[in-house]
Amino acid sequence: MADLPQLIQKAWQQRALLHAAAGQNTYRIFHGFSEGLPGLNIDRYATTALISHPAALHDDLTIITATLLNCHSFDLIVSRPQKQPAKVLRGTAPTIPLEVLDNHIKFQIEPLAANPGLYLDARPVRTWLKQHSENRRILNL
């Protein structure tokens, strides 16, 4: 897809405030549905990029990886095709969970697992919970 690098670069630039935010190194870089390419999502977890994509975009992974590396020096880039196991495109698979920050809260994720362990779409709920749970313990089921 010829305009794929431009779409990803534009999305990266639009998130400049997130890149610079203290206590925040985890967020969605590219949301395909709203950015012109349904099915493709790219999430940032600190120095890791997770590319969730349909099988039809498999041939574009080299372009996506190169574009992401032009935006940021990711240590690890992982492809997560729908209904298939994750695959490392760049870097080395971690042997322990990775620590990331979301709204100054530390989380541990496993980028090669079917579920990395942190839903980025739930940030508003976590923010509300943080505001309303000071000095309390929270059980996450």
Language model segments and positions:
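Non-catalytic accessory regions of SAM-dependent methyltransferases
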Residues: 1-46, 95-97
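Metal-dependent phosphodiester-processing active-site neighborhood
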Residues: 127-128, 141
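Pocket-edge structural micro-motifs
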Residues: 31-33, 53, 109-111
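Solvent-exposed alpha-helices and their adjacent loops that cap or buttress functional pockets
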Residues: 130-132
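Conserved class I S-adenosyl-L-methionine
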Residues: 134-141
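Non-catalytic substrate-recognition/targeting regions of SAM-dependent transferases
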Residues: 36, 40-43, 59-121, 127
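Cysteine-centered catalytic environments shared across enzyme families
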Residues: 2-24, 53-55, 61-80
